[in-house]
Amino acid sequence: MLKIRNYNPSDWSPSWVRSKQPRKQRKYIINAPLHRRRKMMRSPLSKELREKLGIRNVPIKVGDVVRVERGNFRGKEGQVIDIDPKYYRVYLSLDTDRQYPFHPSKLTIIKLDLSDKKRREALKIDDSKYEELKKEGLAI
């Protein structure tokens, strides 16, 4: 889990471009404002979705169905029930009664929740494509 020990929002700069140094990359993520960090919480799409949409990853959203790719729950599928941008974690409902936190990079989106019109516009999905994805079981 990310330690927020030296959290100082004034250290974050929107004009920061990139760095090879891992400590600066970590500093950028830790000190980012929550609305920016929320956009950074992205997960890769499944191969079928990637072929259909032509994009590799999207910001994760409550309602998406995902598959766990790493850890003890590898291979399990669940629905996203909560997102915590402060600790950079996504909570899933798996077979058990508990909610488990996962890092978004360790998940693959299987079904997109496209009920939100703004999300469809952001992903450039028109109504006909949305209906096609729904028919194939790739969208909710």
Curated annotation (Swiss-Prot):
Keyword annotations of the record: Ribonucleoprotein, Ribosomal protein, RNA-binding, rRNA-binding
Biological process (GO), any one: translation
One Pfam family in the UniProt entry: Ribosomal_L26
InterPro entries registered for this protein in UniProt: KOW (IPR005824), Rib_uL2_dom2 (IPR014722), Ribosomal_uL24_euk/arc (IPR005756), Translation_prot_SH3-like_sf (IPR008991)
GO molecular function, one term: structural constituent of ribosome
SUPFAM superfamilies: Translation proteins SH3-like domain
GO cellular component, one term: large ribosomal subunit
Assembly information from the UniProt record: Part of the 50S ribosomal subunit.
Role: One of two assembly initiator proteins, it binds directly to the 5'-end of the 23S rRNA, where it nucleates assembly of the 50S subunit. Located at the polypeptide exit tunnel on the outside of the subunit.
Family under the similarity heading: Belongs to the universal ribosomal protein uL24 family.
Name of the protein in its database record: Large ribosomal subunit protein uL24
Species of the source: Nanoarchaeum equitans (strain Kin4-M)
Lineage start: Archaea, Nanobdellota, Candidatus Nanoarchaeia, Nanoarchaeales, Nanoarchaeaceae
Gene: rpl24
